[in-house]
């Protein structure tokens, strides 16, 4: 066993002595040591209950004959970090999470690992660490929050963000806003729509590294604890058989994950995260795969923020394995991909049942004929940009409008809420990329303001920053190269016409080639003052969003 290096032989007596200080017995020294990394804390709603999930994992490890050891990592709630300096640290925390786990699991040679995340950057950060370490592993998340209820309808956090915009234009009164605020988030779990956290936890199932139901079983359901026990038992079996993450996760696994992402209409952030995770697994993954598959995979799940359903509805309908059954029915699922169950995913999916034909529609009756995400290219995005196609209003699928340029998200939000943005405008927010922000902040407030102000059918937004999984509308993010790296988004001027064609996947600045070249030659990127040692280091090492915003290798 990997842990024998600290357990076996006379020369390891000091190591055993320290382990015995923890209460470890001689009998336990002969068993697999299982590390359990948890992002439990008391400030994130999605993490506040992870201590209970961890206890269930520990029970499962012991049931299977292993010895559990819990260690922590950090976490940030993007919702609470929104609209202030804290959002600059959200994406950078992903790298720190992966690094910290790699350090602990290398310093202590565990035989296996169980990863217990829940929210936006924590799940991908842990998945990156899993790929790097390549120790027998299972991921079990904390699960989604239940939707809130107001005035007879389901609501969630995005309802609150959009109600703020509604209040600004007199569509929502203060009493209603307060009621929505009080009821939208009823308890523990990752926010209830198909936002980044729930998308990533769902894709962990499709990758084969998490138990069935990982992405959809509500946080407060007892089934979540039973799944956690199962995760603890599974990892011990993987240790005994010496099955490692790279034995399970292949390019076919990533293709399954992308197809699930497109079919469900997942978060745009998945493009960024899957690229980074693939890199950690040593897999060559081109983001163009999203666009190639999007032409074949229809959008069949209408889940918030683009539809009325929530994750609990998807769970009731059969969950992610039922979505994969639709792929299987149409001959698209990569059935030979392996799973932590030591069974092929195709065999497991055959056992799944689709329990609601509207929540998980058949391919011949989709919500949209193409998948939920698209990659756009053009003179404004030579390396690509990302859009949530399932959230684009029909009349905005092709749009030409004048640019209104902002150098950060706050100024854009103020302008939108103060009525300075008019129908037809294209809001351009730049210097919000991985290096330029630094930190590639989410632009949830400006997009929610556009929706709340009643402009979603008439205004587009493009940025080198990111979007929350809760953003929707004619919005395009991850524009690469970013402005801080000399990208063309940096040369856009107020009033310039921008053409967006979501069907053709193009994004272009409508100026002459000569004017374009002149501006690019004269362009000197703005350099922002950065008041954080960590963010200065992050900005120095981070690569383009088109490369997953991972660090450059020395």
From Swiss-Prot:
Keywords: 2Fe-2S, Amino-acid biosynthesis, Branched-chain amino acid biosynthesis, Iron, Iron-sulfur, Lyase, Magnesium, Metal-binding. Functions in the biosynthesis of branched-chain amino acids. Catalyzes the dehydration of (2R,3R)-2,3-dihydroxy-3-methylpentanoate (2,3-dihydroxy-3-methylvalerate) into 2-oxo-3-methylpentanoate (2-oxo-3-methylvalerate) and of (2R)-2,3-dihydroxy-3-methylbutanoate (2,3-dihydroxyisovalerate) into 2-oxo-3-methylbutanoate (2-oxoisovalerate), the penultimate precursor to L-isoleucine and L-valine, respectively. One of its GO terms (molecular function) is 2 iron, 2 sulfur cluster binding. Binds 1 [2Fe-2S] cluster per subunit. This cluster acts as a Lewis acid cofactor. Mg(2+) binds at residues 78, 120-121, 442. Its EC number is 4.2.1.9. HAMAP family: IlvD. Homodimer. Pathway: Amino-acid biosynthesis; L-isoleucine biosynthesis; L-isoleucine from 2-oxobutanoate: step 3/4; Amino-acid biosynthesis; L-valine biosynthesis; L-valine from pyruvate: step 3/4. Belongs to the IlvD/Edd family. Its cofactor is [2Fe-2S] cluster; Mg(2+). The modification N6-carboxylysine is found at residue 121. It catalyses: (2R)-2,3-dihydroxy-3-methylbutanoate = 3-methyl-2-oxobutanoate + H2O; (2R,3R)-2,3-dihydroxy-3-methylpentanoate = (S)-3-methyl-2-oxopentanoate + H2O. It is an enzyme of class 4 (lyase). The active site is at residue 468. [2Fe-2S] cluster binds at residues 119, 191. One of its GO terms (biological process) is L-valine biosynthetic process. It comes from the Bacteria. One of its GO terms (cellular component) is cytosol. It comes from Thermotoga petrophila (strain ATCC BAA-488 / DSM 13995 / JCM 10881 / RKU-1). InterPro entries: Dihydro-acid_dehy_C, DihydroxyA_deHydtase, DiOHA_6PGluconate_deHydtase_CS, ILV_EDD_C, ILV_EDD_N, IlvD/EDD_N. This is Dihydroxy-acid dehydratase. PROSITE patterns: ILVD_EDD_1, ILVD_EDD_2.
């Amino acid at each position: 066993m990997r842990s024998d290096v600290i357990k076996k032989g006379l020369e390891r007596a000091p190591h055993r002595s320290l382990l015995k200080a923890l209460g470890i017995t001689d009998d336990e020294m002969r068993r697999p040591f299982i590390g359990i990394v948890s992002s439990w804390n008391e400030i994130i709603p999605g993490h506040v209950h992870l201590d209970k999930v961890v206890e269930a994992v520990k029970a499962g490890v012991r049931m299977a004959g292993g010895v559990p050891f819990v260690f922590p990592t950090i976490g940030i709630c993007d919702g609470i970090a929104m609209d202030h300096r804290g959002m600059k640290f959200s994406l950078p925390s992903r790298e720190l999470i992966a690094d910290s786990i790699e350090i602990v699991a290398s310093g202590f040679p565990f035989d296996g690992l169980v990863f217990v995340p829940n929210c936006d950057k924590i799940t991908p950060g842990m998945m990156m660490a899993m790929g790097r370490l390549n120790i027998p592993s299972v991921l079990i998340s904390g699960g989604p929050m239940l939707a809130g209820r107001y005035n007879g309808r389901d609501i969630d956090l995005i309802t609150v963000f959009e109600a703020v915009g509604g209040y600004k234009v007199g569509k929502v009164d203060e009493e209603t806003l307060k009621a929505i605020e009080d009821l939208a988030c009823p308890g523990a779990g990752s926010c209830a729509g198909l936002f980044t956290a729930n998308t990533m936890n769902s894709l962990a199932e499709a990758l084969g590294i998490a138990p069935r139901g990982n992405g959809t079983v509500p946080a407060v359901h007892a089934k979540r604890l039973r799944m956690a026990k199962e995760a603890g038992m599974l990892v011990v079996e993987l240790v005994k058989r010496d099955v490692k993450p790279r034995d399970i996760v292949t390019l076919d696994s990533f293709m399954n994950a992308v197809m699930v992402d497109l079919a469900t209409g997942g978060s745009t952030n998945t493009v960024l995260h899957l690229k980074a995770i693939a890199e950690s697994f040593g897999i060559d993954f081109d983001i163009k795969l999203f666009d190639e598959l999007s032409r074949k995979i229809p959008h069949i799940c209408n889940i918030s923020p683009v539809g009325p359903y929530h994750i609990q509805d998807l769970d009731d309908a059969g969950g992610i394995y039922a979505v994969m059954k639709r792929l299987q029915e149409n001959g698209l699922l990569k059935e030979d991909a392996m799973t932590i169950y030591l069974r092929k995913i195709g065999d497991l999916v055959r056992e799944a049942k689709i329990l609601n034909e509207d929540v998980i529609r058949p391919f011949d009756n989709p919500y949209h004929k193409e998948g939920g995400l698209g990659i756009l290219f053009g003179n404004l995005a030579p390396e690509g940009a990302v859009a949530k196609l399932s959230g684009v209003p029909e009349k905005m699928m092709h749009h030409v409008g004048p640019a209104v340029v902002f150098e950060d998200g706050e100024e854009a939000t103020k302008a939108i809420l103060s009525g300075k943005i008019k129908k037809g405008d294209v809001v351009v927010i730049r210097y919000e990329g991985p290096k330029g922000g630094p930190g590639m902040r989410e632009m949830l407030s400006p997009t929610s303001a556009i929706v709340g102000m009643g402009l979603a059918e008439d205004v587009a937004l493009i940025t080198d920053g990111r979007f929350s999984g809760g953003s929707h509308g004619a919005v395009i993010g991850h524009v690469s190269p970013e402005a801080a790296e000399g990208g063309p988004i940096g040369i856009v001027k107020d009033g310039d016409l921008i053409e967006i064609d979501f069907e053709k996947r193009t994004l272009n600045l409508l100026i002459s080639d000569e004017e374009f070249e002149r501006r690019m030659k004269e362009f000197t990127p703005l350099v922002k003052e950065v008041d954080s040692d960590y963010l200065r280091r992050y900005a120095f090492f981070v690569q383009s969003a088109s490369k997953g915003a991972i660090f450059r290798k020395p």
